[in-house]
Amino acid sequence: MTTLADLRLIASGKVRELYDLESVADGPSTLLMVASDRISTYDAVHPTPIPDKGKVLTGLSVFWFERTREIVANHMVSTVDGVPEEALGRALVVRRLEMLPVECVVRGYITGSGWKDYQATGAVSGIALRAGLRESERLPEPIFTPSTKADVGHDEAIDFERAAELVGDRKLMERVRDASIELYSFAAEHARERGVILADTKFEFGLPSTETGEGGGEGEPELVLGDEVLTPDSSRYWPADGYEVGHGQPSFDKQFVRDWASASGWDKRPPAPAIPQEVVAGTRARYVEAYERITGEPFEAWLERTGAAADAAGFGGAAGLGASADAG
């Protein structure tokens, strides 16, 4: 049986690893994408993992990949076949893509860095908004606010024209924008029915890799949704009960850790400090609650379908949300 140690690691980020499956799968067309339990704040990874976080991120991505195929193709190939046993539940076999050099942010509410930009300029990514908006207010229509992909430091917000320049194909960028807004609108409606507000989210798209012989055909290139999708790490999810315009909202994400880090006395420079057990437990509870609220099923159902074991024996159920969110 293949193990992670048998595979060639080709990329490692703050949360995910990518492994080459060329030697064990159907040629060079697939990769193994593994979501870890690592968590970062202020661009530094903490030494303390959040149990089951990687499984929540993967399970939610699968939930959305399966439900959005009619909107746009995605890179998911398998959740079990080809996945090493130790990575079950937290890994996907995915298509190899040539990723576009922009992150595709859609905002339905004015919050985070968008709120800061609006306060300063009255606009977000070059899109002028009406005067008098309050923090966390719902926008009349979702807006597409792309950003650069920064290898180091923070991504930079850009307007659509700059995104089209970076991609090098305006028509393709228009397809990306339209798909992003349609994905957001579909997910926001589903979340609303589940008592959750999808305030904003980030998508990443790619094209079939020319290395594998999939790309380069006649006509429009196939647009493929990649990376993770609509998870608490790539999105702001707020509980609808208690939503109130005029301030930051509680959220189903790492804001609980971010708030602790801000109050801990840490100077926000690496190395990041260890996270106390009660903060770990509270953060895990928020991630699991996000999965269960959005999917309508217990988190254990995802573990059973993939043959995975929970990481978090001894952790209690979901805690109530109380930390205010104001991420980027």
Language model region names:
Residues 138-170:
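A short mid-domain helix/strand-loop element embedded in enzyme catalytic domains
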Residues 1-149, 267-274, 278-316, 320, ...:
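Active-site loop/lid in soluble adenylation, ligation, and acyl-transfer enzymes
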